Every structure is written in structure tokens, then in C-alpha cells.
A protein has these predicted regions:
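Short secondary-structure boundary segments
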Residues: 15, 65-66, 135
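Short Asp/Glu-rich motifs
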Residues: 17, 47-48, 143
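Arginine-glycine-biased low-complexity disordered regions
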Residues: 104-191
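Conserved strand-helix element at the start of the C-terminal RecA-like helicase core
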Residues: 2, 6-26, 31, 35-38
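Conserved alpha-helical scaffold flanking the Walker A/P-loop in AAA+ ATPase domains
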Residues: 1-3, 50-51
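Positions that flank functional sites
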Residues: 18, 43, 69, 138-139
């Protein structure tokens, strides 16, 4: 839900173990996102391939452990998501510092449960970090945010049509109407 609500153009997602990196990567891929993992098991050639995909904008989400992510330089990175918070302040600062580099703005999000929250608050106090606490977006929040985003995108495309595109669109209006008439066909549109 966070990824759907935030809609980051790119994100580095941190996990504490390789097993969790594998899990998060597979879940993202099954949801249709461009995601790959960055672990110490990758060969140097594979690492270079993954980084090149990120830099060219062909890979949206890179899921990594702290150890593997040392030295990665991704200046265009918009988001860091800490799927699991680190135990140490230095690791938190290293992770969060991967976004908003070279004067650019960035967003760092840390997911915590009630127990992890107290540890994160200790890190924030020790390092004078101002945290902004927010609940996870609800399904209704995500639906509202995504629908606003899609409507704005479609309206912009509608305003930018030329004569040929208007003519072509007219041919598909009956199909669009028929797809919105039944639940099964509406599901096709939601895909």
C-alpha cells in the first residue's frame, strides 16, 4: 500500500536479511513491479547489470541488505524504504542518507511495529532526527490516491490529443462502454 500511495519513481528497499530480501523482491515482482535484489551473493558482473538497469530507469525497486548496499551511488533515488528497521543508529543514517543526495529532495520511510517503534525513537533522539509518524495508508486511502493520479493522467492525455487521436479514440468508445457494463469486463479495465 505504501508503494501504491507514494508511487516512487525509484526506491531502495532495505531488509535485514537475505531471506527477507528474497521475499520482498518476489512479492514486488508478483505485484507487477520492476524489482530486483542486491545481495552479497551477486557476482560483480550481475551487480553491474543491476546498477545499470537502475541508472537507465529500467529497474524501479532495488531490494538490498545493508552490507550489500555499501558503496552504491544512486543520485536519482527518490525513496528509501526500510522494510525492517536496523538495530543501530549508524545503519539507520546510512540507509536514510541514500536519498536526497546532492541537494535533491528525497523521502525515507521506515516500517515499524510497536516494539520496533521504541528502538527507532531512541535512534531518532540520539541522532537528533525529526521523525514524522504516520499510519499505513488504508485500502480506501490507496484507492482515492491512485484514482486521483489516474484521472489526472488521463485528463492530461485527453487535453493533449490531436485530430487523428480524437478520430481514433471515437472508434474505441463503444468498446470502452461495453467493458464497463459487467463486473468481469470491469475487472479487465482494473488490470
Amino acid at each position: 500500500r505504501i508503494i501504491e500511495a507514494e508511487n516512487p519513481p525509484s526506491a531502495l528497499i532495505f531488509c535485514n536479511t537475505k531471506a527477507r530480501v528474497d521475499y520482498v523482491t518476489v512479492v514486488l515482482q508478483r505485484f507487477g513491479y520492476d524489482a530486483d535484489e542486491w545481495t552479497s551473493d551477486l557476482s560483480q558482473a550481475a551487480r553491474e547489470q543491476v546498477l545499470e538497469r537502475v541508472r537507465r530507469g529500467k529497474l524501479r525497486f532495488l531490494v538490498a541488505t545493508d552490507v550489500a548496499a555499501r558503496g552504491i551511488d544512486l543520485p536519482e533515488l527518490s525513496h528509501v524504504i526500510q522494510y525492517e528497521p536496523p538495530d543501530e543508529a549508524e545503519a539507520y543514517i546510512h540507509r536514510a542518507g541514500r536519498t536526497g543526495r546532492a541537494g535533491a529532495s528525497g523521502t525515507a520511510i521506515t516500517l515499524v511495529n510497536a516494539v520496533e517503534r521504541s528502538g527507532l525513537l531512541r535512534i531518532a533522539k540520539r541522532c537528533s532526527i525529526a521523525l514524522q509518524e504516520q499510519p499505513l495508508p488504508s485500502d480506501e486511502d490507496v484507492e482515492r490516491i491512485v484514482s486521483q493520479r489516474i484521472i489526472a493522467l488521463l485528463e492530461a492525455r485527453l487535453r493533449g490529443r490531436d485530430r487523428l487521436q480524437i478520430e481514433r479514440m471515437q472508434r474505441f468508445l463503444p468498446l470502452a462502454r461495453s467493458l464497463s457494463e459487467s463486473a468481469d469486463e470491469t475487472s479487465l479495465l482494473a488490470m
